[in-house]
């Protein structure tokens, strides 16, 4: 039975918001929040047919709610939920994914039902701890874990990281054979049809959604498809759009075909680690973040749940590998063979990076390093060793190590792109001249710097500047809205030594200010003693310029050291490089 409910906010001047409930399986109710007029989803893509936010209620001997809804539905959703179930009897909240359109009402739900146990991946629970700002019961799950609600409803969990967030899990009810997928297999399509009766009408939006959200993680899509392949699925309960019932094999086949095409020419790095061991989760995510800045795809592989075939395939196909030291074989009988599988699969054209996991029983890092070197692999960065608990400086080291690895893999691609520009256009663009500057930033114990030339004044009121910062620059992580920095202006006749210093290729974690005279600005960032002038700035916004961030910042204060001196000028002849 399908029930439609109008939201009180659906007056003519307001977006149309309605609710729909339907029994979709034994003891199972779908709650669909229909957002008819939403025309944009985050910054990722335009919406042509609105969207829906779907959640699901399962009543066994225990009761579980799978996901919640967008905050714009707060009053009507929570009231409907209380009409469907006594919230004091709600036992579990399954969080497949924590983006606000699915988790926006979790704080409100926990106020009404503080006894609820929140079930999700480790990353999801960590995120919710920051979102909720109050203690709550939680249960961390991953592939192989299950939860028995009684009356035949045994929930099985499947890890699906990077679809399209690192926290994603899928939930399968073996009793009803319903697969709950949140964003995966969804589409932004709003209408009253509960199921996918007309695939030809839905296909364009289904593919558009895949291209915008899932295509960049195609290899992760294929891994998720492999994990759900053994399941008998009669209904795919998605988080957006209609539920998939009539054409399941078609939709899953499309994901498979599109992803297979995507990965054929994709350069990617496989990062092997052991989830929950030491601080490997934190380090591998930070290294992966650094790699992603260079445009190289990543594949995170938890060795505690991966199978031999998966490890072998990824180790063979990856352009680069990162390995976090697992516990020694004396404490684990399953991980040592997987290390052997990696060693047997790699080849000399690959690059490698290693890090200690800090679990107390790590495999020794240097013997493994020697094995990879003997097999002919090129080392992308020095082994990352943990002498103390990780700090912000450790995060900086890992992020820069990942960026170095990614830059190594994209170097040839960048060189090819530089030669593809029309020669006359290349020379014409090269006639654009700018000043020379050193951008410095510090946040806590982490500080960085870069030579900058793509700098212009962007506004009078407020006083603002725009700086183009390549996405793979180390300092990029210190230039988000709200961050502060100093723009040091180089002097025409006194810039060579500073320019040469900051053009050096620094190893990951190196002090870029060693040997340079500095003093702190009011905002804490370093001012270079030998520069002509400086401006203290705060980042206001960033515009995505494909390979650069265009960072708009307001000027807080500044000073000139030599009134009669001129700014150093950067003259180019070609536009395809700095």
From Swiss-Prot:
Residues 429-578 are annotated as: Flavodoxin-reductase-like. Fe cation 1 binds at residues 97, 99, 164, 183. GO terms for molecular function: FMN binding; metal ion binding; oxidoreductase activity, acting on the CH-NH group of donors, NAD or NADP as acceptor. It holds the Pfam family Flavin_Reduct. SUPFAM superfamilies: Flavoproteins, FMN-binding split barrel, Metallo-hydrolase/oxidoreductase. Binds 2 iron ions per subunit. It is an enzyme of class 1 (oxidoreductase). In the N-terminal section; belongs to the zinc metallo-hydrolase group 3 family. In the C-terminal section; belongs to the flavodoxin reductase family. By homology with NorV in E.coli, may be involved in nitric oxide detoxification. Mediates electron transfer from NADH to oxygen, reducing it to water. This modular protein has 3 redox cofactors, in other organisms the same activity requires 2 or 3 proteins. This is Putative diflavin flavoprotein A 2.
